[in-house]
């Protein structure tokens, strides 16, 4: 139950669990399976990214207006567990603390995969979202230091931290921080290989973690792949960043434009054009040299993650 700073009318709508990452680790599929369980109510949109848009703890009125009323309006007292799935929460600083401020008993689900497979997919996703203007992943990786100094930031990028690829992939650091803040008993870490090989068993373990009954679900399709645009120039015309006093603001306002106050999804001509402009696209394979460079860069963190989980994941960074 969320902490007492929220009144009972609002506290039931604060999420009991959060699927916090990692990006491009099949969290969309997992959230879809959880949404189909009648005892679970998932936020609309799936990824509000509410707690990364500010560096402070929001007031109660602000939280209610911009988060609870907008993302969980469709949830009722009949739902046993409310959740959301913002994958930025795992690596963005200060987010877990802000969540725990409102619900000290919040549960966190993390799904991880080999970062050498995750990073190219994540880079392509950033291009799809018009946050990244470098088509070549090796170039984007090499620009990290300069981007941390505020250089070479794409003009449509809502948050430069999205482009700090090495930070996004530091799973060991992220899991250690999550364990320290929330505790191991409030955290469930899933390895993608387990999820892929035994989806039903993984799903049932998650329901047990959430204290939710199994709903008999057995069809666990995974139909979502990477996408890009037929005409990038068209998508740039359709995408107009939300601004405040001339400055680009967080992604929540962008996402909420797509939803009605009751949580139902709008349909506009720009969204219809966007759907027509999408095409399947696979990430470019890593060159042998880039793969070796990533292995060396990520090996210490993966060793650290292995120790935290009591599971050898060295094959992720071994040749």
Regions found by a protein language model. Name each.
Residues 12, 49, 155, 159-160, ...:
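Short, contiguous pre-domain boundary segments
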């Amino acid at each position: 139950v969320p902490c007492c700073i929220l009144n009972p009318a609002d506290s039931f709508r604060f999420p009991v669990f959060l699927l916090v990452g990692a990006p491009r680790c099949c969290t969309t599929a997992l959230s879809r399976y959880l949404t189909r369980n009648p005892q679970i109510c998932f936020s609309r949109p799936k990824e509000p990214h509410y707690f990364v848009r500010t560096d402070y703890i929001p007031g109660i009125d602000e939280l209610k207006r911009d988060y609870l009323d907008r993302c969980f309006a469709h949830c009722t007292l009949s739902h046993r567990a409310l959740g959301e799935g913002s994958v930025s929460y795992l690596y963005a600083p200060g987010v877990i603390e802000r969540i725990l401020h409102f619900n000290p008993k919040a549960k966190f689900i993390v799904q991880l995969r080999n970062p050498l497979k995750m990073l190219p997919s994540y880079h392509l996703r950033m291009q799809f979202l018009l946050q990244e203007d470098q088509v070549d992943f090796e170039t984007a990786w090499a620009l990290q230091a300069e981007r941390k100094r505020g250089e070479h930031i794409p003009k449509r990028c809502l948050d430069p931290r999205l482009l700090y690829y090495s930070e996004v992939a530091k799973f060991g650091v992220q899991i250690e921080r999550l364990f320290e803040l929330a505790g191991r008993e409030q955290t469930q870490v899933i390895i993608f290989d387990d999820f892929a090989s035994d989806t039903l068993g993984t799903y049932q373990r998650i329901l047990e973690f959430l204290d939710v009954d199994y709903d008999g679900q057995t069809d666990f399709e995974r139909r979502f792949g990477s996408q890009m645009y037929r005409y990038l120039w068209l998508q740039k015309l359709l995408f107009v960043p939300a601004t405040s006093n001339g400055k680009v603001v967080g992604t929540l306002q962008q996402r909420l434009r797509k939803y009605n106050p009751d949580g139902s999804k709008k349909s506009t001509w720009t969204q219809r054009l966007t759907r027509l402009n999408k095409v399947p696209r696979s990430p470019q394979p890593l060159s042998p040299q880039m793969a070796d460079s990533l292995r060396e860069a990520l090996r210490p963190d993966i060793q650290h993650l292995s120790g935290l989980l009591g599971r050898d994941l060295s094959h992720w960074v071994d040749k």
